[in-house]
């Protein structure tokens, strides 16, 4: 089954920090659909205030995009949910960063923006490798299928995700 899309990956694996230059570049792309995963890379570098500024700039800038749909995926479940070290940045920031993304999508107020919860893509911890942060090979496959379901409207999360109005 295919959605009939020509996909171009502009992912910045392990290094995306919602930089202004990246936001400006993505806003200029001639695409029908954008999908973004925001969160985990910034957890160890930034506090909530800086994360909020970066996410706001990214999403406000993407309002200039010609994309008809912009799917914003918040942080995937990871070791931050089960960390015993409550001083760990992953533990402290997991929930607050997800909330920042959610609130910012709503604040943007553009019907093209769709919030997809990370747990709709990474549905359980068996998708992760032993570091409980990065997907395993099988996890990548399952996450890809779940993402395709979300983007094409076949996933149950599409009905449950919050749409900015």
Question: What is each PLM-predicted segment?
Answer:
Residues 20-165:
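Alpha-helical cap/lid subdomain in secreted, periplasmic
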Residues 1-12, 16, 20-30:
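Serine-esterase "nucleophile elbow" of acetyl-processing enzymes
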